UniProtKB/Swiss-Prot annotation:
The chain crosses the membrane at residues 41-61, 69-89. This is UPF0208 membrane protein VF_0838. It comes from the Bacteria. Belongs to the UPF0208 family. Pfam families: DUF412 (PF04217). It comes from Aliivibrio fischeri (strain ATCC 700601 / ES114) (Vibrio fischeri). Its main location: membrane. NCBIfam families: PRK01816.1 (NF002493).
Length: 149
């Protein structure tokens, strides 16, 4: 199986969710924060919704409603998977030119501050942007970030 395989998208989505900095400054510019919040909520709540939808039909001995309850349960179980899938696709998407130049500027700012980074990517993806943003928020002071936020 290649790195672009089906299951790798889910793994990349989970990694990207953990990597993306949850900062209020980024919320208006990127949908990641909303998707991450919805995915975390779905991971907590949707398994219970799936179980309750099936169990209520079984408790009330409603065999006619059981197929619909199973469909609802499958949909509820798929909700967190949809979030991980979206995040995995987003993590591996190349940055548009404007964001790529922003990535390069942030990279140079962090290097100038004396931090060690992995080599700059020629065609960065959103997961590299997430790593750079994390480093920027941790290493740079607020005055250095004023230009962008």
């Amino acid at each position: 199986m290649s790195e672009n395989g089906f299951l790798f998208r889910f793994r990349d989505g989970q990694t990207y969710m953990d990597t993306w900095p949850e900062r209020k400054e980024l919320a208006p510019m990127f949908p990641e924060q909303r998707v991450i919040k919805a995915t975390k909520f779905a991971v907590k709540v949707m398994p219970a919704v799936a179980v309750i939808s099936v169990l209520t039909q079984m408790v009330f001995n409603n065999t006619a409603g059981l197929p619909q309850a199973i469909i609802i349960a499958l949909f509820a179980i798929s909700m967190p998977l949809q979030g991980f899938w979206w995040l995995g696709n987003r993590a591996n998407t190349k940055l548009p030119p404007a964001l790529a130049s922003w990535y390069r500027e942030l990279y140079q700012k962090i290097i100038e501050s004396g931090a060690a980074l992995e080599p700059m990517k020629s065609q960065p993806r959103y997961k590299e942007l997430a790593n750079i943003l994390n480093k920027a928020f941790k290493q740079l002071d607020k005055t250095a970030l004023e230009r962008w936020f």
